[in-house]
Amino acid sequence: MACLIRTSPQLVASAFAIPGVEAMVGRRLQSNGSRGNDMTITPEQRTYARLAGIVILAHIVLELFGDSVTIIARGGKSFAETARFAAENEALWRFCLLSVGLSWISIGILAYVLYVVLEPVNKRLAQLALVLRLSASSVGAASLMFRVAQARLYMASETESLFTSEQLRALVAVTQRGSGAGVTIAWMLMGAGYALFFLLFLRSRYLPRALAGFGIVTSAILVVVAALAFVFPQRTNELKLFLVPALLTEIATALWLLFKGLHPRAPAEG
């Protein structure tokens, strides 16, 4: 046994002398040593980064268009006025709901696109961010069923039915609460996923540090605002004002990725 222990270093040295083994080990050590410092951006990453910018802008446009008619423009309107508008413009109302649904689907597409861009930085964190954002897309799209039911109640208010106006108003309020709860949960998942993606952008220096850092902060704000809106649904409209910085950060990120693209990471000193 002592003889084997004394000769083992020589056996190891002879193993490295085998043709091909030394070169293979050298390449492996060089690869491991440069990992984290060599953040070479591939053409695929650049393509997907610009695609991410397009998807972000498309998501914002789809969401604003859908909500502008069904929510924003209906602010301050009575139940009867909203029901009359929905009944008289049924096709427009449903088209706006479709637009909102497509905006939730775009969140899932964006999750995969950002995963392709940031997976080389840290695969585990990128996978977690992907799961969170895909969950947000699923929950948000599922919550749309409440708004579809709400639209049907608006249509029913203009025809003879078994429900009185007060009963329909109560049912609409219930569907609004259900939709709002689903959206706030989706926001929490979105914010958590976005925070991880921006963290990877910060680590890789693919985005300016200020923009990536601000993205982490606004994503955390989105999670907090969503949690508060879930607990205090009557304060949702006031809490939404705190989401303006998150919207501006999204727009800035989209424009940067679309027109500037990814910036390679500066090589480590020493």
In which residue ranges do the predicted regions lie?
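Hydrophobic, aromatic-enriched alpha-helical segments typical of multi-pass transmembrane helices
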Residues: 34-270
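Serine/threonine-rich, low-complexity intrinsically disordered segments
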Residues: 7-9, 20
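Short, Lys/Arg-enriched N-terminal segments with co-localized hydrophobic residues
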Residues: 18-38
